[in-house]
Structure formats: C-alpha cells, structure tokens
Amino acid sequence: MAKVSPQKRTTVEQTPFVVPDLTVKDLLSAIPAHCYKRSAVRSMSYVVYDLFLLYCIYKATVFADARIAPEHISFPNPHLYTFARFALWALYSFANGLVGTGLWVLAHECGHQAFSESKTINNTVGWFLHSALGVPYHSWRITHGKHHASTGHMTEDQVHVPKTRAQEVKQELYDALGDTPIGASLSVASYLLAGWWFYLIKNASGQKRYPKGTNHFAPDATMFAPHHRDQILISDVGIALWLGAVCWAVYTYGFFEVFRVYLMPYLWVNHWLVLITFLQHTDPLLPHYRAPEFTFPRGALTTLDRNTLGDCGRIMGWLGAHLTHGISETHVAHHVSSKIPHYNAWEATDALRKRLAQAGLMPLQGAPVGWAEMYRVFRACKFVEDEGDIVFYKDARGLAQTRPVFNDSSVSDSGIELDKDA
C-alpha cells in the first residue's frame, strides 16, 4: 500500500518474495509419473470436439439470424432488428473466439510435443491448426521453446521482456498521457488488438538485444539457427496459404460475410492470446533474473496461474478454463514440464502446489484473467532497474511492490520503497 509522508515522499510497503532454491528434480518428482503420458487419440478428440463446437455455434447463429425478422418476431422499431443481429453476431464472435483459442492451445501443445508421442503427428497437426489461425508454426515453436528455457531471464527470454529504467523513454506526450487512466486504457486496447502481430512482425515486447527488424518470418533472423531455415520457410508457406484462403473467401463470399464469420473470432483469439500470456508473465509479484541468479527452476516459477474469465462469475470462469483447456489455470506446471498434456496438467498443478507450499514459497496464483486486471498490471509494471541480479517491476513513480527474500531469511533492503523523484 502506497503512503505519502509529511515530506510528500511516496512510500510503499513491499511484499516479500521467497526466491526459489529448488532443483529441477524437486519440481519434476513432485508430479505423478502418469501425468507425463501423452495420447494421440485423446489429444485428437479435443481437436474434433473444438471443431464441432465451432460448427455448432456457427449453425446456431445462422439459425437465429434467419429468425430475426418481422415474420418471426415483432419489434416496436425496425432498427431493433439490425441491433439484434449485431448483438447475435457479436456473441457468436466472442464464443467462437474462446473456442478458437482452445484450438490455438492444442496447436501450441503440438509445438511442445505434448500432443502425442509422435513428432510427425505433432508437427503435422500443429502446422495445420496454427496455419489456419495465422500463426507461423515452426517459427513460433522455436522462439517459444527458447522462452520456456529462459523464462524471466532478462537477456535470454523471448517475450514480455521488461524495459529497464534506461530504456523507459519518457517523452512529453507520455508524461502527459501515458500513466493517466485514459492513456493506460488506450495502450491496453492497442496492445490487445495488435500486440500479437507486432510481436511476430517487429519483435514488440520481445528480447531487447535483438537487432531492429527482427521478425518471425525471416529464415536468417537472429533467433533462428541455420538448420531452422527450412522449417521457417514451411511456416511461411502456411501463412501464405492462410492469406490466400482468406482472400479467396472474401472474393467468393464478400468481405462482410468473412469478417463476421471468421475475422471477428480470429481477432478475439489474438486478444485472448495476448491477454492470457501477458498476465501469465507480468505482475508486480514476479521477479526477473539476470544471469548470475538465473536457474531453470527459478525461471519456471516466474509465472502465475490465473482463471480465464474468473472475474465474471463461477460459470464464466468454468467456461473460460474449459474452452481454453486450462492454459492459464495450469501455467506454472506447464513451465515446469511443457510436455505434460493439458488434460493431465490439472492433477500436475495440484501436486506441484503442494510441493511449493512445503518449500515455503508463495502461491503462484494471480487474480482472474480480465481487462480490469490487465489495466492494473499495465500501470503497475513499467520498468525494472538497470542493475541488480533479481529485479521486480516498478510503476511510473519508480516504486516496486515486491522485494526478494532468500531461504536464509535475508532480504535485499528494508522493505520500504521510496519514490526517489518526489
């Protein structure tokens, strides 16, 4: 909680974060052995289920749309028919956006080889599913694998990498608008709408040491090795086919029809992808490490489990978790072992939480995934310090809400953060 002293200096009481001192064996052995088993048949059943849901939601929407007419329903004003159709298709795009996010998650499991025991099946299914959702499968699979190997590492992580104090440019417009409620809201909206493609095209929020122009479509990009070249080209072919299919559909059915049937749910998928991953890896409670203090277990525990749509009530929280296959609710276990399939991740999560509690570590569970939470986190997480091997996000005033505590009970400071610019 922030306080203003009589000298008009802002202070904040910091939450202690016990820096994990567990080994990889400690984490993996906490999870029951059967949780690591992968089944192609079971995983494929979820693909079929999601595709069936997409079809059913579409057919139900078309059926309802045909009955929003004077011969079926009477409205006092003709404009209400247009409004009702708009509301119906808006609901359709939201629902199929959630289901589409579930398909995205299954393709993501293919990239982790968690879909089945067969690498050929995994990469084939993953390429088709991700290409259909506008994702360069192998390109993203490679950088995402690096993200898992170095989560929370200041110079090796691949996405949601914090700016340092020196990198946080404070222009006049930013000073005037950036940290105001309206400025933060506009930033969050643009991030959710375009953040995914800006990451793919120009490495937005990615590793800061990569050169300008780094992107996921160039075979010779910095984050790829020479032997990745053919895989990147195969990914690019998938994107070219996807763009061609969208253009053909627009030519055949018209832009409006393609927009409401495919593009709006597609934008919702991108929205959920950005919202969920941002909140998994960004919070004032989570540390970031520089090389001297980084270990894989510490990196794996630099994430939070959250409930998608949990802030909208219990039923919506269940739907959010169910339709997105628990990607947000079981994310810590996913980082401990990314080969655990989603249907086993729930049990793995329960077992892992018990082990972390035994080690005296704080529960890695955050507030539900939602716009309000992203707004809060966006304002609280502006930059980290240029120095220090364990750093936490600070807000625009330069205040951190969390401080590191080690197993020997030592702390890095008094636990009171001062606004040094006050």
Predicted regions and their residues:
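C-terminal, well-structured subdomains that either form a transmembrane helix-short loop-helix hairpin
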Residues: 319-355
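Juxtamembrane helix-capping/reentrant segments at transmembrane boundaries
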Residues: 115-134, 157-180, 290-314
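Non-catalytic, topology-defining segments of multipass membrane proteins
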Residues: 1-97, 131-264, 343-422
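Transmembrane alpha-helical segments that form the membrane-embedded catalytic/substrate-channel core
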Residues: 95-107, 136-140, 193-208, 262-305
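Acidic (Asp/Glu-rich) catalytic motifs at the cytosolic membrane interface
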Residues: 100-119, 140-154, 280-283, 329-339
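General structural concept
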Residues: 59, 64, 85-127
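Multipass alpha-helical transmembrane domains of eukaryotic endomembrane proteins
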Residues: 211-235, 277-320, 331
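Alpha-helical membrane-targeting segments
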Residues: 180-195, 306-326
